[in-house]
C-alpha cells in the first residue's frame, strides 16, 4: 500500500518513527498515530498526496455515548486554548462510505452541547475547525445504519491532493505516450525522500514527469534517455489533433511551466546499459520508470559484429552502433548496479517493476548486496498484469564482486522471467479478446 510507505518515508525525513495505535489496520480509512507534534504533522501533510487530512484526536468510540465519555475525559487545559470566548470556530461532520442528510449533520453538531465552546461560530473564516468523523466501513454494498467507529478532533492540516490536479499531464506542455501520472510521480518522490537541494537522476527520463515532481520539492534534476526525439522534443506529438511536436516542447519547458526551471540541470541522449558517469556517489535519489516493451520499446546500443581491436597501422571500416533488444532482466540488473555505485549512502532507488500476476512471487524482485528493499507496492493494471513500486536504500559501498552477485543468487532465475513479460501480456490480451469475440458470436446467434 503506497500510502503507508509514503507516510513512513515522510516521517523518516524528520527522524520520526511510525507509531500506530494498537487498533491500527492498514486498509482502514482512518489511522491513529502516536508520538507526533503538530509541527511533525504539518510537515508530513505539506507533502503527502495519499493522506487527505490530519486531526488532533480529542475523543473516539464505537457509539456516540462512548464518544461523549471519551471527550469528557480529555484534559480541559488542552481544549481551552481553542475554545475561549475570543476565538471563532466551525464544526464539520465528515463520513466515510455514507452520505448524511443536512438535518442529520446538524443534529450531530447540536448533540455536542456538552463541550465548553465559548467562542463565536464562523462558517467562512474560523480560527479553529473541529470535525466529527464517522466510519461506515469500506463495503459500498453493505452500509450499516450506525457507524462502526466515531472520532472527534481539531483539524490540523490537509494533504496535497490538489497537486494531482494542478500538475495533471492533461495540462502539461510536453507529454508522451507513457508520461507518468502526476499523483504517482509525487508518491515516488516521497518514497525516495527527495528534499531541498538533493540531486535526483532518472536514467529513463522520457518526457520528465518524475523530474517535475522532484523539482517541486526543491531537488535539482537531470536525466538520460536513448530516444533522441524525446530528449530534443522532436517527432510526432502524442496529443489528439496535433501531428508534430512544437519547437518549444521539451522537458525544460515542463519545469518552466511550474516555475521550477532553476532546478533543471540537463538531460542527455544516453544508453542506460553503458554508464557515462565517473565512478563516484553522485545522486541523492534515482527515480525511474523503465520501458516494459509494451508501449515503449526496450532498446540499447550494440553491434551485430564481433569487433576486436585491430593491430596498429591497420585500417578497418568504421562501424556505426545499431539498436538491440534490452531484456527486462538486464535492465533491472544494470539499474541496481548503477544505483549501488552512484547513490550516496542512504540514498534511495525507486522504480516500477512490471509483473505477470499469475506468475508473481516476492523472489522475482531483483536484489543487490548494496541495496536494502524498503517497500514493494502493487498497482493493478489488468486481471493478469500489474506493476510493483519498488523502493530500495543504499546500505553499503559496492565491492568488486557485487555486480556479479545476482548470478549466484537463487533469486536470479525467477526474475529472468521478466523477459517474457511482453509475450505474456499480449497472450493474456489475446485470450481476453478471444473470449469477447466468442461471446459476441454467441449473442449474435
Predicted regions and their residues:
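Conserved AdoMet
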Residues: 21-83
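A short N-terminal interaction module
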Residues: 2, 74-140
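Class I S-adenosyl-L-methionine-dependent methyltransferase catalytic core
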Residues: 1-42, 53, 96-97, 123-131, ...
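Residues that form generic nucleotide/phosphate-binding pockets
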Residues: 10, 70-74, 112, 254
Amino acid at each position: 500500500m503506497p500510502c503507508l510507505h509514503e507516510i513512513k518515508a515522510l516521517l523518516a525525513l524528520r527522524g520520526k518513527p511510525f507509531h500506530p495505535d494498537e487498533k491500527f489496520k492498514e486498509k482502514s480509512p482512518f489511522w491513529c498515530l502516536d508520538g507526533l507534534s503538530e509541527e511533525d504533522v504539518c510537515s508530513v501533510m505539506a507533502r503527502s498526496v495519499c493522506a487527505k487530512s490530519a486531526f488532533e484526536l480529542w475523543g473516539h468510540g464505537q457509539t456516540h455515548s462512548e464518544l461523549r465519555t471519551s471527550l469528557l475525559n480529555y484534559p480541559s487545559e488542552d481544549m481551552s486554548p481553542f475554545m475561549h470566548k475570543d476565538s471563532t470556530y466551525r464544526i464539520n461532520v465528515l463520513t466515510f462510505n455514507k452520505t448524511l442528510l443536512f438535518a442529520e449533520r446538524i443534529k450531530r453538531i447540536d448533540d455536542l452541547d456538552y463541550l465548553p465552546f465559548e467562542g463565536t461560530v464562523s462558517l467562512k473564516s474560523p480560527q479553529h475547525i473541529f470535525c466529527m468523523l464517522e466510519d461506515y466501513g469500506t463495503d459500498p454494498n453493505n452500509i450499516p445504519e450506525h457507524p462502526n467507529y466515531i472520532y472527534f478532533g481539531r483539524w490540523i492540516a490537509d494533504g496535497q491532493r490538489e497537486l494531482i490536479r494542478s500538475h495533471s499531464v492533461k495540462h502539461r506542455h510536453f507529454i508522451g505516450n507513457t508520461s507518468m501520472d502526476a499523483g504517482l510521480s509525487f508518491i515516488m518522490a516521497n518514497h525516495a525522500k527527495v528534499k531541498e537541494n538533493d540531486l535526483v537522476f532518472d536514467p529513463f527520463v522520457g518526457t520528465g514527469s518524475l523530474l517535475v515532481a522532484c523539482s517541486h520539492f526543491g531537488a535539482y534534476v537531470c536525466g538520460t534517455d536513448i530516444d533522441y526525439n524525446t530528449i530534443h522534443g522532436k517527432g510526432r506529438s502524442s496529443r489528439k489533433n496535433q501531428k508534430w511536436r512544437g519547437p518549444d516542447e521539451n522537458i525544460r519547458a515542463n519545469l518552466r511551466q511550474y516555475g521550477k526551471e532553476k532546478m533543471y540541470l540537463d538531460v542527455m541522449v544516453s544508453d542506460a546499459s553503458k554508464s557515462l558517469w565517473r565512478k563516484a556517489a553522485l545522486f541523492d535519489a534515482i527515480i525511474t520508470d523503465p520501458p516494459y516493451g509494451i508501449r515503449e520499446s526496450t532498446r540499447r546500443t550494440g553491434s551485430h559484429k564481433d569487433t576486436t581491436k585491430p593491430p596498429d597501422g591497420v585500417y578497418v571500416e568504421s562501424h556505426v552502433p545499431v539498436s538491440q533488444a534490452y531484456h527486462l532482466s538486464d535492465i533491472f540488473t544494470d539499474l541496481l548496479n548503477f544505483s549501488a555505485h552512484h547513490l550516496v549512502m542512504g540514498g534511495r532507488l525507486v522504480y516500477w517493476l512490471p509483473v505477470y500476476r499469475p506468475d508473481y512471487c516476492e523472489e522475482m524482485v531483483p536484489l543487490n548486496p548494496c541495496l536494502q528493499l524498503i517497500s514493494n507496492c502493487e498497482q493493478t493494471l489488468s486481471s493478469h498484469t500489474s506493476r510493483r513500486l519498488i523502493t530500495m536504500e543504499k546500505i553499503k559501498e559496492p565491492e568488486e564482486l557485487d555486480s556479479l552477485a545476482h548470478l549466484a543468487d537463487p533469486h536470479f532465475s525467477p526474475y529472468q522471467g521478466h523477459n517474457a513479460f511482453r509475450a505474456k501480456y499480449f497472450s493474456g490480451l489475446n485470450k481476453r479478446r478471444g473470449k469477447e469475440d466468442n461471446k459476441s458470436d454467441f449473442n449474435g446467434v
